[in-house]
Every structure is written in C-alpha cells, then in structure tokens.
C-alpha cells in the first residue's frame, strides 16, 4: 500500500499574456469595443471587468487540472459540475496489475498526524481494504466489484 499526499498539476500549457488577450477579445464583444484592443490593453481590460464584477467573461478560457485527492473531496468537486471531469475509475483500473505496482494508493489524511493512534487505526483499515480488494479479485470479482 502506498500513501501519498494530495496534489494538483496544471496540464494545460499556460501563456499568461495569451490568456489575457483571449479574455479581452471575448469581453470586448459585450461592450462592442473590439476596436480598442491593442498589444498592451489586455491586462488593464481584464482587471477592469473583474473590478466591475463581470467575472462571467473569465469563463472564456479553460484549463485542465489534475487533482489527486481523497475520493470524498473529488466527489464534492464534481458534484458542483462547474466543469468537465475525468477521474481515475475503480471500474477500469485493476490495482493488481504491474502498472499500479500491484498495490492500491491512498491519500494521506490531513486530519490525522503520523504516529498517533488514529493514524495507526487508519493505516490498518487501509491495509485491510487493500487485502480484501485483492482477495475479491482472486475470487473472480471484477475490479469494479472488488
């Protein structure tokens, strides 16, 4: 069993100036002021729409972010459906395979301190879950069922 810290990774290559220019172009449609676009107008324009509370214009740029977090946290994120999500799936991932190192990966809980009794109980529970998962696979269950 591998214990890891939660983390995020931005997968979209980001160019700050290009992002600002794209948002400016979209936002200026609202104000019919496309003719005011210059090489240096984007940052000031975007700051202005934020100051005016016109944040919807910011939605015209998207990024892809990889979240590695507790399943409960990921379910809170996707529940709000403010974006599109892809998530590691127990339906399609068989953790007994070499690609996973023949082990499950669990996220280190932020609410427990390593070495405390709570930490030890949590770790034992995770090991038992891992053992049960592999036994269910051995008995013929699919990864989704296990």
Where are these regions (language model features)?
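Family-specific signature for flavin-dependent thymidylate synthase
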Residues: 1-145
